[in-house]
Amino acid sequence: MYLDHFVVQNFRNLKKLDIDFDPNVNIFIGKNAQGKTNLLEAIYFLALTRSHRTNSDKELIGFGGEYTNLLGHVRKSQVDLTLRVLITQKGKKVWINRVEQAKLSKYVGQLNAILFSPEDLELIKSAPALRRRFMDQEFGQINAEYLYFASKYRQVLLQKNNYLKQLAKGKTKDQVFLDVLSDQLAGIAAEVIFRRFKFLRYLSHYASDVYAHISLGGEKLAIAYHPSVSTIEADDTVEEIYQKILANFERNKAVEMRKGTTTSGPHRDDIEFKLDGKNAHLYASQGQQRSIALSVKLAEIQLVHQLTDEYPLLLLDDVMSELDHTRQSALLNYIHGKTQTFITTTDLEGISWEIIKKPRVYHMQSGKISFEKEN
């Protein structure tokens, strides 16, 4: 799939853009704070209806504006689509081929996009919250069921935590309703965890293959999922996971009532990256950690293709300068001829032109874009 036409209205500092993209490689060059990252964020938002930089959609509306409008024409192997997202102070709406969609889950997945930024290089050594966000964003865009259950889990978790706070403050003593919420949350959590195990098995397989090609040390990469409920195992059924979570909630009821928060569940789970069985966070060098992060991103591309039969868009936000020549070449060779790629950079120095063939180069300044050349 590829995005061949994109219209942006009032997205951060991008007042009005109307762009035709090359189906292969598009490079955006400009100084910092000119709008390059904002453009990639807009493409990402068109695909996933969420930003990788903020949890507040309102922040995306340009200064002094009342709304943000994104419109994209997407070409896929079997069909062409027109996608639209409208953001206002009241919320957001989405359309597929001019038909408004009542549920975001019906929209997300029509256009797949993988974003790779310098922050992703910190995936291995960052806090668990970033790795959980990684799972929710990447798995959610390729599976509507996961997106639904992850969203529902956040809603019920908030409801349960609010009720726990009331119990902690003595504003209510009704534990029956708490049990109802715990039962509901356990059922949804089981669906989320079951799917995380499934997707991580795929991702670990592909990432291991990629790492074997781009690393020089010969180590074997593996990705392990660690539920906060330690009794849960990778081959458990949804029902078995549900029963274990529910039992854990019951054991920890007094603690949760005292603390006013849910102490276990998908919102407390984590991923571990291992090299030859050792925790990469603790034992891998910085170079090895970067190779792991790169392998995971490239594996995502293969995972999306495996599950959707389409290659996703690849958004490389100022990441080329963070990769040495070996890793940059591995990245470009892997995606060559597969994905429509968008690259932001402050200059064209150091880019492996022997791999990138005839990219379309644009210049960005103060939120405006001009077609510069095909290199």
Swiss-Prot record:
One of its GO terms (cellular component) is cytoplasm. Belongs to the RecF family. Keywords: ATP-binding, Cytoplasm, DNA damage, DNA repair, DNA replication, DNA-binding, Nucleotide-binding, SOS response. The keyword ATP-binding applies. The RecF protein is involved in DNA metabolism; it is required for DNA replication and normal SOS inducibility. RecF binds preferentially to single-stranded, linear DNA. It also seems to bind ATP. GO terms for biological process: DNA replication; DNA synthesis involved in DNA repair; double-strand break repair; SOS response. CDD domains: ABC_RecF. This is DNA replication and repair protein RecF. It is found in: Cytoplasm. InterPro entries: DNA-binding_RecF, DNA-binding_RecF_CS, P-loop_NTPase, RecF/RecN/SMC_N, RecF_2. The gene is recF. The keyword DNA repair applies.
